[in-house]
Amino acid sequence: VMKDPDGGVASLKGETINLVELSVSHYLLARALEEQGLSERDVNIVNTSDDDIVAAVSSDDVRNIVTWNPLLTEAAATPGAEIVFDSSQIPGHIKDLTLVNTETLKDNPKLGKALTGAWYEVMAILESNTQKGEDARAFLGQASGTDQKGYEDQLAGMKMFWEPDTAVAFANSDEAFQAMDDVRQFSFKHGLLGEGAPSADFI
């Protein structure tokens, strides 16, 4: 989000940007800058908690922020503020996942089946136009700091794998491979793979 943007992401060179450091917001910024031939070295990053990010963009001192929903919706409503780049422009890079260690899964194959079954049982409820579905969306909206409508607006703006076959197709795609490679490279560069990681190939 930029206030009174003139030139979009390309104009961020030398600018200060507030975000939660080493988060998906940080990663999104890195990808946005890269697309414009820039890097993190070209900007000044100020680590700002998600509790403070909306108040920050409302102040006169802050012109540029990166954040996630539902905070994004609130921040973008600031007079003069405009979304100049979002995760839809790098599809497949920012995902919400449930992961299980490979060896653990090999040793406990029933665990994978149980988790997957539970996941898609919840997905079916979440997608449904039933009272159960409405209750689930209202609960998750409140849990994520918004309400049912706010949560449903978020769902409408996300690519959801409602069916298992679409998730499998994506996981096996070149797009997913490239996205995960970019994520691990970023993670290694910023020390997120741990002190003992010798290279990005650690993951």
Regions found by a protein language model. Name each.
Residues 1-78:
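Bilobed "Venus flytrap"/periplasmic-binding protein-like clamshell domains
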Residues 19, 40, 83, 148, ...:
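Residue-level detector of short coil/turn "hinge" positions at structural boundaries
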Residues 22, 43, 86, 150-151, ...:
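Residue-level detector of family-conserved "landmark" positions at structurally sensitive sites
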Residues 51-147:
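Pocket-lining segment of extracytoplasmic ligand-binding domains
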Residues 106-194:
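Secondary-structure end/capping motifs
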Residues 191-203:
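Intrinsically disordered, low-complexity polar segments
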